[in-house]
Amino acid sequence: MSMLRLQKRLASSVLRCGKKKVWLDPNETNEIANANSHQQIRKLIKDGLIIRKPVTVHSRARCRKNTLARRKGRHMGIGKRKGTANARMPEKVTWMRRMRILRRLLRRYRESKKIDRHMYHSLYLKVKGNVFKNKRILMEHIHKLKADKAHKKLLADQAEARRSKTKEARKRREERLQAKKEEIIKTLSKEEETKK
């Protein structure tokens, strides 16, 4: 059997692949050995004596299966961990995510007129100061603030109504007293006139 190194090299350059991917027909070695140019190699490829081997399968099925399992939390125990907690999930990244979520919520509430700009500003600073652990707590805080505000407004309205009521009552009382005084003065003046 003759060496077919040259033919393999020529075939790999024609097929534009590695020498490992070139298959030479073992039954036609003599014919292949005679070919010593690109043109002849092209003819052999056309005839099917030289073939480019298909790409070897590198399956990702196992990898996909493991990834799905990891999403559920499998294979993630203490024994599988190499880096520190901060290296695995940086504190800065979690902080940025939380800030973006909370600030987005505040912006949405301000745009939909659920909170005014003053409340927005104070809550924005509180968010920055790490007051709220998550979105739910911030929403509860906003609802509580709004409820307190509504309650204060109700109390203020009630107090105002009470004040106006007492004011009106005082005014009526004064009017009654004034009318009584005028009546008494009239009766006294009449009596004096009759005496004369």
Curated annotation (Swiss-Prot):
Listed under GO biological process in this entry are: translation
**Which GO cellular component terms are attached?**
cytosolic large ribosomal subunit
Q: Which residues carry this modification: Phosphothreonine?
A: 187
Write down what this protein is called.
Large ribosomal subunit protein eL19
Citrulline occurs at 5, 16
Among InterPro entries, the record links this protein to: 60S_ribosomal_eL19_sf, Ribosomal_eL19, Ribosomal_eL19_CS, Ribosomal_eL19_dom, Ribosomal_eL19_dom1, Ribosomal_eL19_euk
- Phosphoserine occurs at 13, 164
Keywords attached to this entry:
Citrullination, Cytoplasm, Isopeptide bond, Phosphoprotein, Ribonucleoprotein, Ribosomal protein, Ubl conjugation
The record's section on Gene3D superfamilies has: 1.10.1200.240, 1.10.1650.10
The post-translation modification note in this UniProt entry reads: Citrullinated by PADI4.
- Family under the similarity heading: Belongs to the eukaryotic ribosomal protein eL19 family.
Determine the domain of life of the protein's source: Eukaryota
* One function term, GO molecular function aspect: structural constituent of ribosome
List compositional bias (Basic and acidic residues) regions by residue number: 159-181
Function, in words? Component of the large ribosomal subunit. The ribosome is a large ribonucleoprotein complex responsible for the synthesis of proteins in the cell.
Gene name for this UniProt entry: RPL19
Q: Which HAMAP family match?
A: Ribosomal_eL19 (MF_01475)
Q: Where in the cell is it found?
A: Cytoplasm
**What NCBIfam families does the database record attribute to this sequence?**
PRK08570.1 (NF006343)
Q: Main localization of the protein?
A: cytoplasm
Pfam families in UniProt: Ribosomal_L19e, Ribosomal_L19e_C
Q: Where is this cross-link: Glycyl lysine isopeptide (Lys-Gly) (interchain with G-Cter in SUMO1)?
A: 181
**Subunit details for this protein?**
Component of the large ribosomal subunit.
